[in-house]
């Protein structure tokens, strides 16, 4: 039989509980905000990209759900402003590939410099695949895992056991239904795989090989959805059976900054160690810069956290403090039951 929660404890315990809820709420809001924010930025600079035309270099932003353009409209009067049609662009803007679309009228509907394509063009000369082909399973599932964490945090803020299980059950059911409908019923998985295959074959035309990659993406994404549903079931059962299991509902989301860095570094390693032999220039496999400044040939690289990563750190810090406070409460409850 589970020990009764300390909802009727003294003023000190009630104050602790309110603090736990406040910290968890701050963490929840910070993580939701981080999903829509750039987490990391990377920039390339070189002599052939003058600072007047490219004040931030060739810059891209990594979000939890993909890679976005990091270049902004040029300052009026600068070289870039004089030579191109200017406008800030985002992931929904029509794009032109500077290699494959060389014969197109690039001024038609032009919106300015797209640094994602610019960096892809630079990278393909050494045999690197387009950046957006990285994390092809993680990106479309990111929103569901963030929702999974949000439900756990919401439940962690609830002290009463039945209410907590209800929050977990309803929340997890909603996330599972959302994932299934989004990926399979609405066909977003199929459209994602199609876009992945097209992007992967942008520079290196090996249709059979790349289609096999697309099939793997479809398979692993289905496995990912299954793992997500299984993880939700394990959490619900764990909270139902074990009192101390509730601490994992704060610990796992608190590790999000670590998860991101490991994922980011792993995919950088993949890109640097899986260079296509058709690249115009031959370079040895290398590890791109994860944090700080580096140099590859004439290019200087810069890789640093963006404000979205700070939001993840805020969420992590709040959750760890809330976890320690809740752990202290659980120990007090255990000691009281033995007295």
PLM features: residue spans?
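Membrane-interface capping segments at transmembrane-helix boundaries
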Residues: 324-335
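Alpha-helical transmembrane segments and their helix-start/interface "positive-inside/aromatic belt" motifs
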Residues: 14-31, 159-176, 240-255, 322-325
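Hydrophobic alpha-helical membrane-insertion segments
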Residues: 28-39, 168-187, 248-274
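Hydrophobic alpha-helical transmembrane segments
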Residues: 138-157, 174-177, 219-236, 310-320
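Membrane-proximal helix-loop-helix units in multi-pass membrane proteins
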Residues: 163-171, 187-253
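Short, Lys/Arg-rich, polar N-terminal cytosolic tail immediately upstream
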Residues: 1-14
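Long, glycine/tryptophan/cysteine-rich extracytoplasmic
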Residues: 36-139, 182-218, 265-306
